[in-house]
Structure formats: structure tokens, C-alpha cells
């Protein structure tokens, strides 16, 4: 028998890949050779996936009015609601694409919004722009009238208001303003005993009153007034006028007929219906959505309410008692309440002239102090009741709840924001009449303000009606 063991061992060693230096250098079938490790690759900047796009947005501070519209690249627009703190454009911008943000429409409330920093650029990530809303600079011009008192219809500075220029006047020559639905301005030309009408083009005509001092009813051309102070239209287009020295409230119907709506003409403060009631120098007047009139019965120191049927009651204040107490109804007190404004919720705002305050009355008759510390002054403040006024006599409110105040003795137009911030819109307080921007403008002594739907504020000042618009 042949010796087969060495051959078998050799075969097994070969099958296991073993063997010394004398073994085969070729691996057996089914085995792999070890490989050297690969070197790490150098890091690279990540590439943007094809089709990536980014948001363009804004963070908003201080927006208290409606009407702000922002646009990206002209066509992508967003209307930003008042009180909003952010917005996002609907169309994203592709990576590397351009954005350019503009403001096609600024908000109401004489606010102005702008971007802090760059307004345009290219995108490589989401963009968030800081939008800051502050008080706008306004321009002041004259719509109608001149420095010379008189009486003349005409256009712009050719018109005359204010009566006899030789007459020594301790009070105002022009009083209240109101607007009709077409945007025409009406002014109580007190010392001419007339109601005047001014179109938006500045054309002045006489709306009612013969110019004779009195309280005779009749047609618009023949009726007489005694220092008319303020006016308001009802939904049907009838005008109601507080006829201060006649101590009554007059009505001018749409056909021009003038009648006495409420008040006996006796200097008193008695509730009643129609001419059975009486007033003491009625001043401001507004109307609510139900057709009720509210009157600042200045020298009786109360606010009166007149229903559409002519029923007169005392709504707030203590009759014939001057004071500044807050409270409900007749528990409250005023001191020469003059101009009034009313908001969409039916809250009344009162220019409490001799208290140097703005008061608020809820529909339930609850009276509080809305603005003013009571001290005479011209100080603005972020806290309404810390601000000071100097004989505020008239108010107007816009759709966003901003109040505008004719602060007569400070010769300024003031603004109270819904958050209670009091600022000066226009007027340097130097008691002259110049047409400039904002606080560089000056007034003789503004006596009335009214804000229209196009965001224009009209002011009765001296023998002129002035116009304030955003720069």
C-alpha cells in the first residue's frame, strides 16, 4: 500500500489556503485578497437642490390702522390687518432670484410704515424684513379762506369767512365742520350767522342763512341763525345744527327748509320734547346709527340726547354743575363740554374744554377720562391720561378709532391712538398761520376737525379751512 497521508495533508493545506513559502501564490477559488483602505474625500459645499425657493416675509411693529398694502416685485401683494405682527408673501422666490418690497398703500391714522434696512436683494434663504410703523409727516395747506375776515363766496383764497373784520372777537370766527357723503365740507361760519359749503376743489357757497343774527325759520336763503356751532347729517341727508346763542337745535331738510327741531330758545336746561325742551349754549353734535342726536350742552355742563322724535333727555353730567367726576349718567360731571365724536360701537368722546380732558361715555352712560391729566399744556405721552391739553374744543374719529383733537389754546392738532398714545400731528404752537409740514406748520387756534374717507383731515382755523394730508 502506498503512503497517502503526506499527500492528503498537502491537499488539505492547499484547500485551506495554508502552506509555507513553498505553497502556491495563487489563491484558491472562492477567496478574496485584502484591499488597502481608501483615502477620505475632501468636504464640499452642499449644493442647492434644483427647484428650491424661499419665503419673503415681514415682522411688523406698531401698526394700529388698516389699509397697509405691501408688494414684492410689484405684483405679489399682501393687505396687512391692523394689529398684525407679521405677514408672508404668497409667492416664494427661487434661490438666487430677486426680491424688492414696496408699499403701494400706507395705513390710515396718519401712520407711515417703512422697512429698516435693505428693501431688496437676492435670496439664498428665507427673508424676514423688519417693518416699523410710526407717525407720518403731514402737509398743511389752505382749502379756502384767507387771513382777512369777511363774507364772500368764491374759490379758495378768494372766499371770505368770519364776518366783520373790524369786529373785536374774543372767541372763534369759524366753528364746527362736517362732511356729506360726497366729501363736501360744511363749516359753521359763526360770526356770519351762516352755514357754508366747500367742495373738494375749494369752491365756497352759502348753504343756509341770510346773514342776519336771529332764529327765524324759513327757506335756506331767508332763515336766520345765531352763532351756529356744529352740524351733522342724518342718513336721509337732513342737517342738524346747534345754534349756540339761539339755544336750540335747528334742522335743515334736504329741500333747504329750516325749522327748529328742539329747544325753546330760553337759556335753560330742561328736558322735554321738541321746543318744550331748553338748552344753554349747545355746542357739539353727533348722531348714532339709530338716529339719536347727542349734544354738548356747554354752559349747562351736560350731554343731552335727542331721539328721532325730538325727545330731549340728559344723558350724562350734572345739570348746571361744573366738575370733572367720572361716574354713570348724571353722577358724572363736565366743565363746558364742547365737541363730540362717536365710534362704531356707539361710544361718545367729549372734548371737555375747561377740564383740558377728553372724556368717554359708553352707550350705557358710563363716563371715564380717556385722555388728559387735567393740567393745561401741550405734552404728548404714551399714556393718554398723562398727556396735557389746552382747551380742546372739538374731535373727530376715523374708522380705525384714532381720535383727532382741535387743541385750541395750544394751537395744535393732536392725535390719540387706540392704544392711548397722544401725539402732535401738526402745529408749532406759535399762534400764527403758516403752511408747512407737520410740527413746522402753525395755526391761529384750531376750533374744529373732521376726517374724511380719503384720509384727509380738515381743520377750521381763524378765517380759513385748512387741509392736512400725508406727505
What are these regions (language model features)?
Residues 184-186, 238-240, 292-294, 347-349, ...:
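Conserved beta-propeller blade signature
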Residues 59, 86-120:
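Surface-exposed interfaces of beta-sheet-rich extracellular modules
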Residues 190, 244, 298, 353, ...:
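Short loop/turn segments immediately following the C-termini of beta-strands
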Residues 2-58, 134-135:
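Bacterial Sec-dependent N-terminal signal peptides
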Residues 445-471:
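Blade-level signature of beta-propeller repeat domains, shared across WD40, Kelch, NHL, RCC1
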Residues 137-174, 203-227, 257-283, 311-336, ...:
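Gly/Pro-rich loop segments of beta-rich domains
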Residues 193-197, 203, 247-251, 257, ...:
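A short loop-to-beta-strand structural motif that recurs across blades of beta-propeller domains
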Residues 179-182, 233-236, 287-290, 342-345, ...:
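Residue-level detector of Asp-centered blade-edge/turn motifs that repeat once per structural unit
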Amino acid at each position: 500500500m502506498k503512503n497517502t497521508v503526506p499527500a492528503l495533508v498537502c491537499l488539505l493545506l492547499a484547500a485551506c489556503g495554508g502552506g509555507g513559502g513553498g505553497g502556491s501564490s495563487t489563491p484558491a477559488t472562492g477567496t478574496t485578497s485584502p484591499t488597502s483602505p481608501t483615502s477620505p474625500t475632501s468636504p464640499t459645499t452642499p449644493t442647492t437642490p434644483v427647484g428650491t425657493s424661499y419665503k419673503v416675509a415681514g415682522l411688523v411693529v406698531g401698526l394700529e390702522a388698516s389699509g397697509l398694502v405691501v408688494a414684492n416685485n410689484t405684483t405679489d401683494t399682501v393687505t396687512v390687518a391692523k394689529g398684525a405682527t407679521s405677514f408672508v408673501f404668497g409667492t416664494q422666490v427661487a434661490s438666487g432670484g430677486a426680491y424688492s418690497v414696496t408699499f403701494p398703500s400706507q395705513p390710515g391714522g396718519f401712520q407711515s410704515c417703512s422697512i429698516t434696512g435693505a428693501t431688496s436683494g437676492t435670496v439664498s434663504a428665507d427673508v424676514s424684513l423688519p417693518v416699523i410703523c410710526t407717525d407720518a409727516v403731514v402737509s398743511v395747506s389752505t382749502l379756502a379762506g384767507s387771513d382777512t375776515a369777511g363774507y364772500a363766496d368764491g374759490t379758495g383764497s378768494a372766499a371770505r369767512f368770519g364776518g366783520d373784520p373790524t369786529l373785536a372777537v374774543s372767541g372763534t370766527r369759524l366753528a364746527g365742520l362736517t362732511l356729506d357723503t360726497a366729501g363736501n365740507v360744511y363749516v359753521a361760519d359763526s360770526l356770519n350767522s351762516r352755514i357754508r359749503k366747500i367742495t373738494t376743489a375749494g369752491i365756497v357757497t352759502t348753504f343756509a342763512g341770510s346773514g342776519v343774527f336771529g332764529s327765524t325759520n324759513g327757506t335756506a336763503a331767508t332763515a336766520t341763525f345765531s352763532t351756529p356751532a356744529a352740524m351733522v347729517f342724518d342718513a336721509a341727508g337732513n342737517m342738524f345744527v346747534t345754534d349756540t346763542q339761539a339755544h336750540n337745535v335747528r334742522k335743515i331738510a334736504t329741500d333747504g327748509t329750516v325749522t327748529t327741531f328742539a329747544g325753546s330758545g330760553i337759556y335753560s336746561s330742561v328736558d322735554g320734547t321738541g321746543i318744550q325742551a331748553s338748552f344753554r349754549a349747545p355746542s357739539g353734535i353727533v348722531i348714532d346709527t339709530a338716529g339719536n342726536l347727542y349734544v354738548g350742552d356747554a354752559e349747562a355742563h351736560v350731554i343731552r340726547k335727542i331721539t328721532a322724535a325730538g325727545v330731549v333727555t340728559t344723558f350724562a353730567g350734572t345739570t348746571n354743575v361744573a366738575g370733572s367726576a367720572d361716574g354713570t349718567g348724571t353722577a358724572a360731571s363736565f366743565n363746558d363740554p364742547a365737541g363730540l365724536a362717536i365710534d362704531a360701537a356707539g361710544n361718545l368722546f367729549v372734548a371737555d374744554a375747561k377740564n383740558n380732558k377728553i372724556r368717554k361715555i359708553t352707550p350705557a352712560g358710563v363716563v371715564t377720562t380717556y385722555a388728559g391729566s387735567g393740567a393745561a399744556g401741550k405734552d404728548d405721552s404714551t399714556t393718554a391720561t398723562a398727556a396735557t391739553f389746552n382747551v380742546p374744543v372739538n374731535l373727530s374719529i376715523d374708522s380705525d378709532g384714532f381720535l383727532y383733537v382741535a387743541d385750541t389754546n395750544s394751537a395744535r392738532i393732536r392725535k390719540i391712538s387706540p392704544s392711548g398714545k397722544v401725539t402732535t400731528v401738526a402745529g408749532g404752537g406759535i399762534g400764527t398761520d403758516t403752511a408747512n409740514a407737520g410740527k413746522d406748520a402753525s395755526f391761529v387756534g384750531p376750533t374744529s376737525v373732521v376726517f374724511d374717507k380719503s384720509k384727509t383731515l380738515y381743520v377750521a382755523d381763524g378765517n380759513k379751512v385748512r387741509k392736512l394730508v400725508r406727505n
